């Protein structure tokens, strides 16, 4: 079942951010754009490369009014341990949510019930708490955060410009389309 267009289900969680443990709920997503980046496990292989890449794009996402949350089924304590022991992860300044109950991973339909780990899933959530994009990758395939920045820009553009759509390879300032009878068969 697709989660696009669905409101994020209620959750409460603990996260590690900037040397502190914080509380995060679905209500924190309201009023701003958010990105949820699920990954299988701390102290693994592809995950630290993805999270470091996401940190490298964090300033660009913040400029767009986006808050970033990474999520795994590890606890917030494990996130702190990983942050304190990994050169790549020590750079992270966005919230690292612990989901040991698997509630959030299940709510976003990324939980692998067999392993108890989250799949690699990325979700862009609008200021109303509604999921606008979903990307799920196989465990061995890392994500590119620069593509994520462009997807956020496209989602924001479409929200601000009802009736327009962003075609493939759209970049900010690029040409958009206005679906109409006139365009049928001409693209």
Curated annotation (Swiss-Prot):
Top class in the EC scheme: oxidoreductase
Gene3D superfamilies named in the record: Glutaredoxin
Entry-linked Pfam families: 1-cysPrx_C, AhpC-TSA
Cytoplasm among keywords: yes
Subcellular location: Cytoplasm
Record keywords: Antioxidant, Cytoplasm, Disulfide bond, Oxidoreductase, Peroxidase, Redox-active center, Stress response
Residues annotated as the enzyme's active site: 47
GO molecular function, one term: thioredoxin peroxidase activity
Induction and repression of expression: By heat shock, salt stress, oxidative stress and glucose limitation.
EC number assigned by the record: 1.11.1.26
GO biological process: cell redox homeostasis; hydrogen peroxide catabolic process; response to oxidative stress
Domain Thioredoxin: 2-157
One GO CC annotation: cytosol
Subunit-level organization: Homodimer; disulfide-linked, upon oxidation. 5 homodimers assemble to form a ring-like decamer.
Family as reported in the entry's similarity comment: Belongs to the peroxiredoxin family. AhpC/Prx1 subfamily.
Remaining remarks: The active site is a conserved redox-active cysteine residue, the peroxidatic cysteine (C(P)), which makes the nucleophilic attack on the peroxide substrate. The peroxide oxidizes the C(P)-SH to cysteine sulfenic acid (C(P)-SOH), which then reacts with another cysteine residue, the resolving cysteine (C(R)), to form a disulfide bridge. The disulfide is subsequently reduced by an appropriate electron donor to complete the catalytic cycle. In this typical 2-Cys peroxiredoxin, C(R) is provided by the other dimeric subunit to form an intersubunit disulfide.
Matching PANTHER family: ALKYL HYDROPEROXIDE REDUCTASE C (PTHR10681:SF121), THIOREDOXIN PEROXIDASE (PTHR10681)
Record protein name field: Alkyl hydroperoxide reductase C
Species the sequence originates in: Bacillus subtilis (strain 168)
Record gene name: ahpC
